[in-house]
Amino acid sequence: MQDKNVKIQGNLVRVHLSGSFLKFQAIYKVKKLYLQLLILSVIAFFWGLLGVVFVQFSGLYDIGIASISQGLARLADYLIRSNKVSVDADTIYNVIFWLSQILINIPLFVLGWYKISKKFTLLTLYFVVVSNVFGFAFSYIPGVENFFLFANLTELTKANGGLEQAINNQGVQLIFWEQTAEKQISLMFYALIWGFLQAVFYSVILIIDASSGGLDFLAFWYSEKKHKDIGGILFIVNTLSFLIGYTIGTYLTGSLLAQGFQEDRQKPFGVAFFLSPNLVFTIFMNIILGIFTSYFFPKYQFVKVEVYGKHMEQMRNYLLSSNQSFAVTMFEVEGGYSRQKNQVLVTNCLFTKTAELLEAVRRVDPDALFSITFIKKLDGYIYERKAPDKVVPPVKDPVKAQEN
């Protein structure tokens, strides 16, 4: 049986080469609202569940504004327990850690509504509410606080005893470097896995044209305005917010707890409380998140696209008559073997637009050669066509339209 991708022409063999340009390429084609909400619901489910496992009871901090919520939750938990207030400390902790994020996001929803887009804001609002409700519900699963993938950090802490045990007994998951390395290694794997999974989840959320809320609104707005890669911006924003949350929830709270405990090596408000494994591995987690987000969602990676074919005039007319925002250059080339004339269409565009451009090319010329070259550096200006007030419907069959 002859391979349909191979065609013999005389003493030449024509082979069809193909490959996916984008990670999660199928997600880019999801435009129906109910499918987008379904995908966000699935991600929100795992975001909440894994957030409880990897963050809430491990001593790591979540990304973005959630770090501040978690820090406030741990401080409130300490104040309630130390002052013996007659309220359920676990419930207060869970409410502040999960549900308070919805309230904190309200001003940022307003920013997104007016500065980014209404659909972006509504999809983000949906994800923030659903993921935090899931996380709040999962935090009440019996025994979830003792569920660990690699090592039971609670039992290890009890075995070590001393100041670390006293602090952890009050709900502050703090690890010191002087103790057994088993906890540090476990925490490192937690950071590695959760950082990678967050990058996968977050990239899919961005492709759908939403975000995880919080300070991501500011990062996304700045990224859109300045055309900067969002992975690096997310790392900066997440690190700053984490340092605030960590200072409140671990450094301050742990030091206050240690004031009533006689310990020579770890002084309250000392360097051991600040430069703990919790701090180092959460920063490591944010680095993993930033690197893989840029890899999975290269929003501002520019490429040079060259299209070789016989219907480039129809291709040009199609791009100009549709809502595609591609600036094109055309020239004629001659084949070195056949001496046949062919046209080449060249454009510089964002890598995330290549799948869309390829689909447009295939509508006009299924046999065209589509080539992509990554651009390392650019120096100059780019022009982006604004969406018209009234959308012009694209030509459904550009080849027949050209012939007519």
From Swiss-Prot:
Pfam families: DUF2179, YitT_membrane. The chain crosses the membrane at residues 37-57, 92-112, 122-142, 188-208, 230-250, 272-292. It is found in: Cell membrane. GO terms for cellular component: plasma membrane. Gene3D superfamilies: 3.30.70.120. The keyword Repeat does not apply. The keyword Nucleus does not apply. Signal peptide: none annotated. InterPro entries: DUF2179, N-reg_PII/ATP_PRibTrfase_C, UPF0750_membrane, YitT. Its main location: membrane. It comes from the Bacteria. Keywords: Cell membrane, Membrane, Transmembrane, Transmembrane helix. It is a multi-pass membrane protein. This is Uncharacterized protein MG432 homolog. It comes from Mycoplasma pneumoniae (strain ATCC 29342 / M129 / Subtype 1).
